[in-house]
Structures are given as structure tokens and as C-alpha cells.
Amino acid sequence: MPGRAVVSLRIALIAAVAAAGAACVDPDPPARPTALETAWVEIADQLFELELALDGATRFRGLSDRPRIPGNGGMLFVYPRPRPLALVMRRCPVPIDAAFVDEEGRVVAIRVMEVEPPRAPGESVAAYEARLPIYASGVPAQFVVETAGGRLGELGLAVGDQLVFDTEALRQRAR
């Protein structure tokens, strides 16, 4: 049985993910998906058109309930300031790659996020949340780029690589 410190840390991480917003995290399906503004991001000499997640509600919803992610598509999460970030895979029927990016556009961490079993009938939201793996940046980041699972590996993206996009303009728009 985990010690009290481990349980407390897990609870703190779950709270941090809920407060920060994360990938594929809407516990209830949206009534109707809305079209989001997009931005172009250059990743390993390839252009990606990424949906923008500029506010807490959009970051919280993330890529949930998407049956597929286009090969050069995905989402760009923008936060008002750099901080340690964490993601979970809720209601995501497809695997996702996540690149945590600093305020300069440099990759500081990469996570491969696998599909998690959906919330079971009779399973409480709290129990569902508690069983989801947490994918943490480990260091401060201001942006997260999410793409189809395996895509960042195909491109050979690595920690330290530079992404090309207008970090300053997006940073000013984050709420």
C-alpha cells in the first residue's frame, strides 16, 4: 500500500492537472464541437496546422472525443506563463504525442500518451480520474504541441529542438 506521502503527491498532481487543463480531458461530451482558430507551427521542417487552446476551458477540453488527428494537425496549448505542466488522456480514442515547449519555442520534454480505457459504467468521476496516468513536463513549459500518436517520433523530434511559431503573439493572447 502506498505511503501517505505518495497518496498526497498523487492527489496534488491530479489537482494540478485539473487546474491547469490538459489533453483530452472533458469528462462529459460537448454538445457540439466548435471550430477553433488555428496557427501554423514548423516542426522538424514540416508545417503543422494546429488548433489553438488559449483559455482554460479549451485547454481542459483538449482533443477529447476526436476519432482521428490529421497527420500534420493537432493542437497547440498556450499558457499565460511558463510553469510545470501535466496532461492526462481522458476521452481520447487515439494515441497522442505531446511536446512540452518553453517560452522560446524549444522542446523541453516529449511524452507518448496511450489510449486509456473509457470511464466504466458505475465508475465515479473521482475513481476514473485517479486511475489516469499523468504525463508531466518535469520542467517549466509555456506551450504544449499535441499531434497524432507516433508523429513526433516519425519526425525525429528531440528535447532541445526548436519549433518555429510566433511565441510572443500567442503568449499575449493566453488567458
State the predicted function of each range:
Residues 1-13:
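Bacterial N-terminal signal peptides that target proteins for export
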Residues 20-23:
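C-terminal motif of bacterial Sec signal peptides marking the signal peptidase cleavage site
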